[in-house]
Amino acid sequence: KMLDAVRGKLKQGEHFSEEEFDWDRLEAHGDGVKYGALGAHAIISCEGAQSALGESKLEVTGFSAVKGEVIKVELAHDLGKECIHQGHFMIGEGGNRALVGATYAWDGFEEGPSALKRQELEDHVQKVWDGSFKTIGHKAGIRPAVKDRRPLIGPHPKEKNVWVFNGMGSRAVLMTPYLAQHLVEHFMYGSPLLEECLPARMVK
């Protein structure tokens, strides 16, 4: 809901365009870049799993993509907004529903949710929950994790005026708001970047 609200506000001021990005349209322009009618000092790539799986035209090294799955369950009684964490998480969403996850796999990226991982998560619910439940949803996704488990934030090591904001695996994703604010402050006020997160560290 928050993202929808922010997106709507940006659209009102014509600061947001929803379209498929084409790297071939990006041009060097003076000390910055140009994309169609838009000009900027730099462009920030936030392509997530698309980069992690090598499906972006912008080559970014250092990823170790991880597949994860979650299920949504309907419980016999309400968990409220509580969270149970014992190997997997179980987060109450209100209305007798909860989200349970997440699994880890380093293959099967092209496949959807698997029966094996669904069973793993349902077994977990039976272990931590004293009551009946029914699975009502099952999803799979790709974490754009990085080999050293730190995000990739900073200038691209080879492409001028191209920056990277990626690598939010299962741990770094919790810090995404802080990391985004950190990058904004660098552009606005010149505050130093986090050296341990620079993409250049992954280039040998």
PLM features per residue range, with description:
Residues 1-42, 46:
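Helical element adjacent to the flavin cofactor pocket in flavoenzyme catalytic cores
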Residues 1-5, 112-117, 174-175:
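Short beta-strand to alpha-helix junction loop
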Residues 1-9, 120-124, 179:
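Mid-domain beta-loop-alpha active-site segment that forms a flexible
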Residues 14, 38-39, 129, 183-191:
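Short, hydrophobic alpha-helical segments
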Residues 19-21, 47-48, 103, 167:
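Short, well-ordered beta-to-alpha junction loops that form the rim of enzyme active sites
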Residues 28-33, 97-98, 162-163:
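Hydrophobic residues embedded in beta-strands of well-ordered beta-sheets
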Residues 47-161:
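Active-site substrate-recognition segment that forms the wall
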Residues 134-204:
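C-terminal catalytic lobe of FAD-dependent flavoproteins
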